[in-house]
UniProtKB/Swiss-Prot annotation:
Function: Plays an important role in the de novo pathway of purine nucleotide biosynthesis. Catalyzes the first committed step in the biosynthesis of AMP from IMP.
Molecular functions per Gene Ontology: adenylosuccinate synthase activity; GTP binding; magnesium ion binding
Primary localisation category: cytoplasm
PANTHER family documented for this protein: ADENYLOSUCCINATE SYNTHETASE (PTHR11846:SF0)
Keywords: Cytoplasm, GTP-binding, Ligase, Magnesium, Metal-binding, Nucleotide-binding, Purine biosynthesis
Stored SUPFAM superfamilies: P-loop containing nucleoside triphosphate hydrolases
Organism ancestry: Bacteria, Pseudomonadati, Pseudomonadota, Gammaproteobacteria, Lysobacterales
Cofactor binding: number and manner: Binds 1 Mg(2+) ion per subunit.
The organism of origin for this protein: Xylella fastidiosa (strain Temecula1 / ATCC 700964)
This protein's name: Adenylosuccinate synthetase
Residue positions of the active site: D14 (proton acceptor), H42 (proton donor)
Length: 430
């Protein structure tokens, strides 16, 4: 029986991870976020009520489930407090169930200013970040000048670290980008207020996870973004700033390889991408626009329209291999309802040669031309179907083809946004 399950994106993010995490948290001990920040946007629909979470794990809507934020997550104090208060306004008990690693880095105001200044200066070469300071915060972490949750407990040490960081970042902001610098005293005072607020939630997340493992409790590791946006394995430099793979779950939560029993990869029945970067199967036509409209493909965090395209098996197989994915969850099947024909990319034409492997650089991806297999669509509605047998034959054939081509079994199919709109073929915890 699986005790610890990692849920992660197998495409370019926005695959529907939040719904699946919520679905699987009915009888578990904890959900842990292990990377990213409030650039994530996990949308949950329960009894037709929509909730969008950016930083807090998706298990928060389940009473009694412990929600953990690991050391691999970068935390915006303002965003965290806002999200907690919005959830508390709905009557949920949050702070007694939310535990935050002292080793988690903080996103400071100067990180946001730097992120936005860079994107503006880059013009047409911009990465397409959310402008929320995620990348600069990770840079400071690696550069060993980051301020972490633990530093808030020591006011003198906090002041020293903040002055040093501001000296560095204000120089870059004012001298290189020509924008205003940040005021030390105002930021320091705000951090002291946040220190008092976050102190009761500060906990040894890795220690909690080890204890839960010993107790035989189920734990779900919730990824953000997607494998193809991974800082190492994605379409660099059009990537996020953290490790979105199963390796990121280990280092970002503080557990070992032996602590993971099942890796669930989430993929849409088609493909989407936000921001810049290569996207071989992109549909820049009325078909792509139709998918965008039916799938409501607009960012939960930014509202930006998502680029839409056909399912890319070459990219999906790469995600399966990198993560050692045990089973797939295919989401948004119902978005394809009513389409006459569907296509799946099974290979690339690259430099006059056919390849079933993805290039290792963004320029290589840009030079790929997809090779498609065509499948008949279906006119019947799949929305809300909860049984495999009730799916239209053409929909079942499409899913079986995805499974065979990806070389990985499909364990879950999502047929709508609500928690109940799901076909459970295999429970990852079973």
């Amino acid at each position: 029986m699986g005790q610890s399950v990692v849920v992660l994106g197998a495409q370019w993010g926005d695959e529907g991870k939040g719904k699946i995490v919520d679905l699987l948290t009915e009888e578990i001990g904890a959900v842990v976020r292990f990377q990213g920040g409030h650039n994530a946007g996990h949308t949950l629909v329960i009894n037709a009520k929509k909730t969008v979470l950016h930083l807090i794990p998706s298990g928060i809507l389940r009473n009694g489930v412990l929600c953990l934020i690991g050391n691999g997550v970068v935390i915006s104090p303002a965003a965290l407090r806002k999200e907690i208060e919005e959830l508390e306004d709905t009557g949920l008990e949050i702070r007694s169930r939310l535990k935050i690693s002292p080793a988690a880095p903080l996103i400071m105001e100067y990180h946001i200013a730097l992120d936005q200044a860079r994107e503006k200066a880059a013009g047409g070469r911009a990465i397409g970040t959310t402008g929320r300071g995620i990348g600069p915060a990770y840079e400071d972490k690696v550069g060993r000048r980051g301020i972490r949750v633990a530093d808030l407990h020591y006011p003198d040490q906090l002041a020293e670290k903040l002055r040093a960081a501001l000296d560095y970042h204000n120089f870059v902001l004012t001298r290189y980008f020509g924008v205003d610098g940040m005021d030390f005293q105002r930021i320091y005072d705000e951090m002291l207020v946040f220190a008092e607020y976050v102190e009761p939630m500060k906990s040894d997340v890795a220690g909690i996870l080890h204890d839960l493992r010993k107790q035989g409790k189920r734990v779900l590791f919730e990824g953000a973004q997607g494998t193809l946006l991974d800082i190492d394995h994605g379409t660099y430099p059009y990537v996020t700033s953290s490790s979105t793979t199963v390796g990121g779950a280990l280092s970002g939560a503080g557990v070992g390889v032996q602590d993971i029993d099942y890796v669930l990869g989430i993929a849409k029945a088609y493909a989407t991408r936000v921001g810049g970067g290569p996207f071989p199967t992109e549909l820049d036509d009325k078909i792509g626009q139709g998918i965008r409209d039916r799938g409501v493909e607009y960012g939960a965090s930014t509202g930006r329209p998502r680029r839409c395209g056909w399912m890319d098996i070459v990219a999906l197989k790469r995600a399966v291999a990198i993560n050692g994915i045990t089973g797939l969850c295919i989401t948004k099947l119902d978005v394809l309802d009513g389409m006459d024909k569907l296509k799946i990319c099974i290979a690339y034409e690259y430099h006059d040669k056919r390849s079933e492997y993805a290039p290792l650089d963004a320029q290589g991806w840009e030079e790929c031309t997809p090779v498609y297999l065509e499948f008949p669509g279906w006119n019947e509605s799949t929305h809300g179907i909860t049984s495999w047998e009730k799916l239209p034959p053409a929909a079942r054939a499409y899913l079986c083809a995805l499974e065979e081509l990806a070389g990985c079994p499909i364990g879950i199919v999502s047929t709508g946004p609500d928690r109940e709109h799901t076909i459970m073929l295999h429970d990852p915890f079973a």
